[in-house]
């Protein structure tokens, strides 16, 4: 996942602390175990904060004293966003509003919001919600008066990351099931 890869890269730098804020405590526990096994000394720099971007009090505590923030929280599975579009808006748009408002108020200097290639000319609930997330971020960037630098970056399908088609296709092939192709004319780009 992006979070795991980002933490591994960030540990290469001389950072005082890396905070992982997530509502998925199972993933946090797994990451903590893996970090301690790989390098117990570096792992001391990483702290885990359970919470939800829709819960302002947990967000405020986690962001206090932070210099840079990477906002990767999202409802990112296209089928989930299609089935639950209100949750896509709540998490991807309103959750981002909470993160940005809290981060700017706390004096965070640099904020990067992760988006998706599906936000360009969106046709899905996920793409639409991420396009709106970008609009929210850019509105905050204009209002931040230079105190907080805010940007968005788009990336596409990361090969073998959670929720991409490759693990799904491997599972379907191994179990002898047909591959689920949404649209045979579609081209999928993987990084």
PLM-predicted stretches and their roles:
Residues 33, 47-68:
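Conserved Rossmann-fold cofactor-binding substructure of NAD(P)-dependent oxidoreductases
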Residues 22, 49-50, 90:
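Conserved residues in the N-terminal Rossmann fold of short-chain dehydrogenase/reductase
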